[in-house]
UniProtKB/Swiss-Prot annotation:
<protein>
    <recommendedName>
        <fullName>Endoribonuclease YbeY</fullName>
        <ecNumber>3.1.-.-</ecNumber>
    </recommendedName>
</protein>
<dbReference type="Pfam" id="PF02130">
    <property type="entry name" value="YbeY"/>
</dbReference>
<keyword id="KW-0698">rRNA processing</keyword>
<keyword id="KW-0862">Zinc</keyword>
<feature type="binding site">
    <location>
        <position position="134"/>
    </location>
    <ligand>
        <name>Zn(2+)</name>
    </ligand>
</feature>
<keyword id="KW-0540">Nuclease</keyword>
<dbReference type="GO" id="GO:0008270">
    <property type="term" value="F:zinc ion binding"/>
</dbReference>
<keyword id="KW-0479">Metal-binding</keyword>
<dbReference type="GO" id="GO:0004222">
    <property type="term" value="F:metalloendopeptidase activity"/>
</dbReference>
<keyword id="KW-0378">Hydrolase</keyword>
<dbReference type="GO" id="GO:0005737">
    <property type="term" value="C:cytoplasm"/>
</dbReference>
<feature type="binding site">
    <location>
        <position position="124"/>
    </location>
    <ligand>
        <name>Zn(2+)</name>
    </ligand>
</feature>
<feature type="binding site">
    <location>
        <position position="128"/>
    </location>
    <ligand>
        <name>Zn(2+)</name>
    </ligand>
</feature>
<keyword id="KW-0690">Ribosome biogenesis</keyword>
<comment type="similarity">
    <text>Belongs to the endoribonuclease YbeY family.</text>
</comment>
<dbReference type="InterPro" id="IPR002036">
    <property type="entry name" value="YbeY"/>
</dbReference>
<dbReference type="InterPro" id="IPR020549">
    <property type="entry name" value="YbeY_CS"/>
</dbReference>
Length: 172
C-alpha cells in the first residue's frame, strides 16, 4: 500500500500571516514529509493547523497549559476514537497552533529563514500529535533526531546545530 498523507487543513486566523504568502504551502509540505517519515497510520486521518498570532496562542497556552504567555507552537492531540464512531469516519489526529510573532522573532534572532523555522515548528507539532514528546532527555533526543531527518528531506538545515555547539562549548 502506498503512503497517504493526512488531510491537513491550514487555517489562517491572524492577519499578520498575510506577510508570508507561502506559509500554507510550507506547513503542508512539512506535515507531509513528517507523516511520510514516522511509523503512524495517516491514511484517512485529519489534522488542522491554525496560523495565529501571539495573543491567540497566549490564550490557548493559558487555558490549556496554565501558562499565561505566548509560545511558538502548541499541539493538541485528539482523543482516541470511540467505539461509537462509524468505521469510515476520518481519524482526527489533533490540532496545531503556531504564533506568528514568536516564530518571526525566533527566526530573526537565530538568523534562520522564516520558512525553515516554520517548517521545523510544523514538524515538531505534528510529531506531538502522533505520540512523540520531549519530557525526558531520551525522548527529546529521539524527537530531535527525527526532526533533523525530516527537515533534511525538506532541505532545511539542522535546527539544533547552534544549540549543540553551545552545549559542546559548555562541556569543553
Amino acid at each position: 500500500m502506498s503512503f497517504v498523507p493526512p488531510a491537513t487543513e491550514v487555517l489562517i486566523v491572524a492577519d499578520c500571516w498575510q506577510a508570508e504568502s507561502e506559509a500554507e504551502a510550507v506547513v503542508l509540505r512539512a506535515i507531509e514529509a513528517a507523516a511520510a517519515m514516522v511509523d503512524a497510520e495517516t491514511a484517512d486521518a485529519e489534522l488542522a493547523v491554525m496560523l495565529s498570532d501571539d495573543a491567540g496562542v497566549r490564550t490557548l497556552n493559558a487555558n490549556w497549559r496554565g501558562l499565561d504567555k505566548p509560545t511558538n507552537v502548541l499541539s493538541f492531540p485528539a482523543l482516541q476514537p470511540s467505539a461509537t464512531m462509524p468505521d469510515d469516519a476520518p481519524r482526527m489526529l489533533g490540532d496545531i497552533a503556531i504564533a506568528y510573532e514568536t516564530t518571526r522573532r525566533e527566526a530573526d534572532d537565530e538568523g534562520k529563514p522564516f520558512d525553515h523555522h516554520l517548517s521545523h515548528l510544523a514538524v515538531h507539532g505534528f510529531l506531538h500529535l502522533v505520540g512523540y514528546d520531549h519530557e525526558t532527555e531520551s525522548e527529546a533526543e529521539a524527537m530531535e533526531q527525527l526532526e533533523r531527518r525530516i527537515l533534511a528531506q525538506l532541505g532545511v538545515p539542522d535546527p539544533y546545530a547552534d544549540q549543540d555547539r553551545a552545549d559542546q562549548d559548555r562541556v569543553n
